[in-house]
Swiss-Prot record:
Necessary cofactors: Mg(2+)
Protein name: Polyphosphate kinase
Gene Ontology biological-process annotations: polyphosphate biosynthetic process
Function of the protein: Catalyzes the reversible transfer of the terminal phosphate of ATP to form a long-chain polyphosphate (polyP).
Start and end residues of each stretch annotated as Disordered: 705-734
Active site: H452 (phosphohistidine intermediate)
EC primary class: transferase
EC number: 2.7.4.1
Keywords on record: ATP-binding, Kinase, Magnesium, Metal-binding, Nucleotide-binding, Phosphoprotein, Transferase
Residues involved in ATP binding: N67, Y485, R581, H609
Binding site for Mg(2+): R392, R422
Record-level Gene Ontology MF annotations: ATP binding; metal ion binding; polyphosphate kinase activity
Catalytic activity of the protein: [phosphate](n) + ATP = [phosphate](n+1) + ADP
Length: 734
C-alpha cells in the first residue's frame, strides 16, 4: 500500500511538472531537413579524419555528393512543390514553413558544399605526393596533348551530339543529373548557342602516363579543349559546364492501376524529366548573360544555384578511387571480410535453430549463412514452401537465384517484391518479372504502403510434421550491402513467431484481414502504440523503483508522438540514451525538457543500420529488433516488423553492443542542447566501436580455424585490398 501511495504521489508530482512546460515549443526540436544536412556534414568530416587513408577520404567526399543528389531530388523537390502550391503551413516540430526551410537549406548547404570543395582541392594536392596529378589539357606537354587528342577522337567524340538552340531547335530536355557544356558559336550571321550533353556511360576522366607520373584529366575539360571538332567551320566564343538535378519525387498512381509494374515503368520514364530543382556551375563561369538565360529556361530561382570551386559532380571520385586503388592499395582501408557468426559456429543452421535462436551481426559476421538458409531450402526435398519479402537486393542476387531454383524444384514460393523502393524500382521490376517467369507467386506490395519488413519463412516436413523456420532482420536481403551495412538478424523456430509469420504473409497476399499477432508487432500504427505503451510503463517503473532506462539505436528519429513521450519520460527522470546515425528532430539536454536524454551519432567506415529498442523494466528488460526507424513514415506509411529478443544471451549481446557504441570516442559525436554535434572527448583509451568489433570477429574466426573446424559462413583473414566504398554510392541515405 505504501508503494502504491508513493507511486501515485510521484505521478501527481510528474504531471504537475509537465504542466509547467510546453513541449511543443520549436526551440526543443531540430528541423528534419537541416538535421539531415548536419548528418551529411558528419559524413564529410570523415574526409578530415587523420586515421582514414587518403583514398577513403576522397570516397567520403564522393558519398557527401551522392547523398546531396538524392536530398535535392526528393526532399528539396518536395518543399519546392509545396511552395508552388501555396502551402505555407509550418511543419510540426521546428515550426518552419516550406519557404523558410528552403532558405535555411540554401544557407547551411552552401557552407557545407564550400567546405567540401575546399577539402577536395586539398586532398587532390596530396595525390601529387604519389605521382598522381589532376590537370587541365592545357597543362600537358605537346606529346601528351597529342595522345589525349587521339583518345578523344577514338573514345569520346563519336558519342557526342551538339544540340543547337534557335527558333527551329527549342531548349532540349536535359536528363536528370546530366553534365552539359553550354557553347556560344559565331556563325557569321549571328551568335548562336548549343548544348553538348556528356553521355553518362563514357568515363568521367581520362588518364595519361609519363614516366612515373599519371595525369588525370576530366572528360568535360577534354571536350571543351577539343570543342572545335563539334563545330567545324564556326568560331567557338565561350563555353561553360553545368549540371542539372531534377525532381524525382513524383507520384505513383496506384489507385486504378491495372498493372502496378506498368505504372512503375511509366513513373520511371517521367522521373527522368521532372522539373529542375538545382543548377550547379563552375565558379569560374563568367558568362552571366548565358547563365541568366539558362536559369530562365530551367525556371529555377537563385536559391537553386550553386557555384562550385572544382569539377561538378564529385561522385566521379568513386571511379577515381577504384582506378587508383590498384596502384595505391596502401591508401585504402585494410580489407575486412565478414567472419563466421559466433552464435552459429560450425553447426548446421537448420539443426541448430531447432534447439535455440541464432543471432547474426553483419558485416562483422558473414551474411553467407542467410544466403545458405534460402539456398539449402531450395535444394532440400523436405522443403514445402518458402516465403520472403524483398526490398532492395543486389543486381546479381544469389537469393533471387535460389528462390527461382526453389520454384523450379516444385516448392511453393511466395515473394513480396516492393516495387516502390525508391531508386530501386527498375531493379525490382526486373526481379519481379524474372521470379514470375520462374513460377514464383509474386506480390507487388500493398496499396499506399511500402513493405519495408525483412522476413523469410521456410516450411519443411520433418518427421511427418511441418516445421517453420523464420528469419527476421533489420536490413535488406542484399549480399553486397551486407558487407557494408551494420545489421542484425535472428533465425528462430519459435512456434508463436512461426504462426505470426504465416499470418503476416497471408495478410500481405490480400487473403486475410489484419491478424492478431502473438509476438510480432507490425506497422502501420502498432509499432508506435507499443513504443508509447513501453515508455509509459518505463515511466511508472522508474517512479516506483528509480532505475528507469531506455536505449534506442536507429537511423533517424522524426516521429513527434514518440519524441513527446521521450520528453515525458525524461521529465519523469528516466535515463534515455539514443544512438541515432542520421536525422534527429529531438534536442537533448534541455533543462526541464530533455535533460535526461543523450544523443550520439556514429559515422564511420561502415553504415550504421541496425534498429534496437531496449526498455529496462526494473531489470526485466524488453528488447526488440526492427526494420523500422522511429520516423512517421515507418510508423504509419510502411509495413514494418518489430520483433522481441527473448533469448537472454542475445539480449545481453545487444546491451553490450549499445554500451560499446555509447563509449566510442573516435567516431561518436554527441548532440548538445542547441542541436550541434561534437566529437566525443574523454580521457579513456581510444575506442572505435566498428574497428573493435571487426577485431573481435577476426579473433573468433581464428579460434575456429585453430580447431580445424569448417565454420558456417566464410572465415576471413585481414589484408589490404581495393576500396570498399566503390559499392557504397547510396550507402548513407537509407
Amino acid at each position: 500500500m505504501h508503494n502504491k501511495d508513493k507511486l501515485m504521489r510521484c505521478m501527481y508530482s510528474m504531471q504537475t511538472r509537465l504542466g509547467e512546460k510546453d513541449i511543443n515549443l520549436p526551440q526543443y526540436y531540430n528541423n528534419r531537413e537541416l538535421s539531415w544536412l548536419d548528418f551529411n556534414y558528419r559524413v564529410l568530416q570523415e574526409s578530415y579524419d587523420k586515421n582514414n587513408p587518403l583514398l577513403e577520404k576522397l570516397n567520403f567526399i564522393s558519398i557527401f555528393s551522392s547523398n546531396l543528389d538524392e536530398f535535392f531530388m526528393v526532399r528539396v523537390a518536395g518543399l519546392k512543390d509545396q511552395v508552388k502550391m501555396g502551402y505555407d503551413k509550418p511543419e510540426n516540430k521546428a515550426q518552419m514553413t516550406p519557404q523558410e526551410q528552403l532558405d535555411a537549406i540554401k544557407i547551411k548547404n552552401t557552407d557545407y558544399v564550400n567546405t567540401q570543395y575546399q577539402r577536395y582541392n586539398e586532398l587532390i594536392k596530396e595525390l601529387a605526393n604519389y605521382d598522381i596529378e589532376m590537370v587541365k589539357p592545357e597543362d600537358l606537354s605537346d606529346a601528351l596533348i597529342e595522345k589525349l587528342e587521339q583518345e578523344f577522337k577514338l573514345s569520346v567524340l563519336p558519342t557526342l551530339t551538339p544540340l543547337g538552340i534557335d527558333a527551329y531547335h527549342p531548349f532540349p530536355k536535359l536528363n536528370n543529373k546530366s553534365l552539359n557544356i553550354f557553347v556560344d558559336i559565331d556563325t557569321e550571321d549571328a551568335i548562336n548557342s548549343a548544348i553538348v550533353q556528356i553521355p553518362s556511360l563514357i568515363p568521367r576522366f581520362l588518364t595519361l602516363n609519363e614516366g612515373t607520373k599519371q595525369y588525370v584529366v576530366m572528360v568535360e575539360d577534354v571536350i571543351t579543349y577539343f570543342i572545335n571538332y563539334l563545330f567545324t567551320g564556326y568560331e567557338v566564343l565561350n563555353t561553360f559546364t553545368f549540371r542539372i538535378t531534377r525532381n524525382a519525387d513524383l507520384t505513383i498512381h496506384e489507385d486504378g492501376a491495372e498493372d502496378l509494374l506498368i505504372e512503375i515503368e511509366r513513373f520511371l520514364k517521367e522521373r527522368k524529366s521532372g522539373s529542375a530543382v538545382r543548377l550547379e556551375l563552375d565558379c569560374r563561369t563568367s558568362e552571366k548573360e548565358n547563365v541568366e538565360w539558362l536559369i530562365n529556361q530551367l525556371e529555377i530561382e537563385d536559391n537553386d544555384i550553386y557555384y562550385l570551386d572544382g569539377p561538378l559532380d564529385l561522385t566521379f571520385l568513386f571511379g577515381l578511387v577504384d582506378h587508383l586503388s590498384h596502384k595505391l592499395k596502401y591508401l585504402t582501408y585494410e580489407k575486412y571480410t565478414p567472419q563466421p557468426p559466433r552464435s552459429l559456429g560450425n553447426k548446421n543452421i537448420y539443426q541448430l535453430s531447432l534447439e535455440r535462436d541464432i543471432f547474426f551481426h553483419h558485416p562483422y559476421e558473414s551474411f553467407e549463412p542467410i544466403v545458405d538458409f534460402i539456398r539449402q531450402a531450395a535444394d532440400d526435398p523436405n522443403t514445402i514452401a518458402i516465403k520472403q519479402t524483398l526490398y532492395r537486393v543486389s543486381k546479381d542476387s544469389p537469393i533471387i537465384n535460389s528462390l527461382k531454383e526453389a520454384a523450379e524444384n516444385g516448392k511453393q514460393v511466395t515473394v513480396l517484391v516492393e516495387l516502390k523502393a525508391r531508386f530501386d524500382e527498375e531493379n525490382n521490376v526486373h526481379w519481379a518479372r524474372m521470379l514470375e517467369d520462374a513460377g514464383c507467386h509474386v506480390i507487388y506490395g500493398m496499396t499506399h504502403l511500402k513493405t519495408h519488413s525483412k522476413i523469410a519463412l521456410v516450411v519443411k516436413r520433418i518427421n511427418n510434421e511441418l516445421t517453420s523456420f523464420v528469419h527476421l532482420g533489420t536490413g535488406n536481403y542484399n549480399d553486397k550491402t551486407a558487407k557494408l551495412y551494420t545489421d542484425m538478424g535472428i533465425i528462430t523456430t519459435n512456434k508463436d513467431i512461426a504462426e505470426d509469420a504465416i499470418n503476416f504473409f497471408n495478410y500481405l497476399s490480400g487473403y486475410s484481414t489484419k491478424p492478431e499477432y502473438n509476438k510480432l508487432i507490425v506497422a502501420p500504427y502498432d509499432i508506435r502504440d507499443v513504443f508509447i505503451d513501453r515508455i509509459d510503463k518505463e515511466i511508472r517503473s522508474h517512479l516506483q523503483h528509480g532505475n528507469g532506462k531506455i536505449m534506442m539505436k536507429m537511423n533517424s528519429l522524426t516521429d513527434k508522438t514518440i519524441i513527446e513521450k521521450l520528453f515525458e519520460a525524461s521529465q519523469a527522470g528516466v535515463k534515455i540514451q539514443l544512438i541515432i546515425r542520421g536525422i534527429c528532430c529531438l534536442k537533448p539536454g534541455i533543462p526541464g525538457i530533455s535533460e535526461n536524454i543523450e544523443v550520439v551519432s556514429i559515422v564511420g567506415r561502415l553504415l550504421e543500420h541496425s534498429r534496437i529498442y531496449y526498455f529496462h523494466n526494473n531489470s526485466e528488460a524488453h528488447i526488440y529488433l526492427s526494420s523500422a526507424d522511429v520516423m512517421t513514415r515507418n510508423m504509419i506509411k510502411r509495413v514494418e516488423i518489430l520483433f522481441p529478443v527473448e533469448d537472454k544471451s542475445i539480449g545481453q549481446r545487444l546491451v553490450n553492443y549499445m554500451n560499446l557504441q555509447l563509449s566510442d570516442n573516435q567516431k561518436g559525436r554527441y548532440q548538445d542542447a542547441q542541436g550541434l554535434y561534437h566529437y566525443v572527448e574523454n580521457n579513456s583509451s581510444p575506442l572505435n566501436s566498428q574497428s573493435y568489433l571487426m577485431q573481435e570477429a577476426i579473433k573468433y574466426g581464428e579460434e575456429l580455424k585453430k580447431q580445424s573446424v569448417q565454420p558456417s559462413g566464410q572465415p576471413v583473414h585481414s589484408r589490404r585490398g581495393g576500396s570498399w566504398m566503390r559499392k557504397l554510392k547510396n550507402t548513407f541515405k537509407r
